Amino acid sequence: ACDTSDIRLSRDIFAVATDPDIDILVELIGGIETARELVLTAIKNGKHVVTANKALIAEHGNEIFQAAQDNGVDVAFEASVAGGIPILKSLGEGLAANHVNWLAGIINGTGNFILTEMEEGGRAFDDVLAEAQALGYAEADPTFDVEGIDAAHKLTILASIAFGIPLQFSKVYTEGISRITTEDVASAAHFGYRIKHLGIAKDTGNGIELRVHPTLIPKETMLSAVNGVMNAIMIDGDAVGPTLFYGAGAGAEPTASAVVADIIELGRALTVDHDERVPY
């Protein structure tokens, strides 16, 4: 068992952000304004930050990153997109030698669960949404999931890393799935397609196109085979071609996996002994 006897507890989050004995602050409280104030306070007090807060990064990341640069600290946010899939590190490091032509992904598990059940069970949107809420996949207010806002937050972050552009959440064309009917899904299937709710970012040559909307995908493509609450992101690079990343995009354990990975990476960077950084 893990010994937790020396762990200090505090009811004051800002006391944590200003404590000189703390090197890394991990923000998992959600929301935007309080989280923004907490993160900026930690940064201004010389602390590295780990967060899973996609809304915070998508809407205030430019300000946060500038503050981090000014104060010589890092902000890690792998868990903000696609849960346990290490997509941000893959884009920023593993595919760094590529020019990304486009990326497209199923990046909201709730919406994908709803569309999958509508197709496979012939069920109405409202019926499946109620089940998703009962299973804990959707919130009591499902607006962010079914109207594409959650996916737009994630796409904003993906595009920033893929194309080296500032975060531009306000410029994402966003359309949800709440108007999709059982008849729509059946008609798509009749013609050899599936309806998937995609986040798409594309280098058009004249700029970066950012959009989230329901999309007809041929059944024989890899993205069309992604069912339930799973996530998948396909990235087309000039050197590697189309590359698919697939896995659990949400949930406590996949998210925790990404958060802890960021903590470990920052911890290694704080270690002066190079021997601690070898991969074995």
Where in this protein do the model-derived segments appear?
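ATP-dependent carboxylate/acyl-activation modules
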Residues: 221-280
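Rossmann-like NAD(P)H-binding beta-loop-alpha module
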Residues: 69-150, 157
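N-terminal glycine-/serine-/threonine-rich beta1-alpha1-beta2 phosphate-ribose binding loop
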Residues: 1-45
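Rossmann-fold NAD(P)-binding glycine/threonine-rich loop
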Residues: 29-45, 52-94
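Substrate-binding/catalytic subdomain of NAD(P)-dependent oxidoreductase enzymes
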Residues: 128-225, 230-232
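General beta-strand structural signal in soluble alpha/beta enzymes
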Residues: 9-10, 18, 26-27, 49-52, ...
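Conserved active-site and cofactor/substrate-binding residues in soluble primary-metabolism enzymes
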Residues: 8-11, 20, 59, 82, ...
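Predominant activation on well-ordered alpha-helical scaffold segments within soluble catalytic domains
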Residues: 14, 40, 65, 88-92, ...
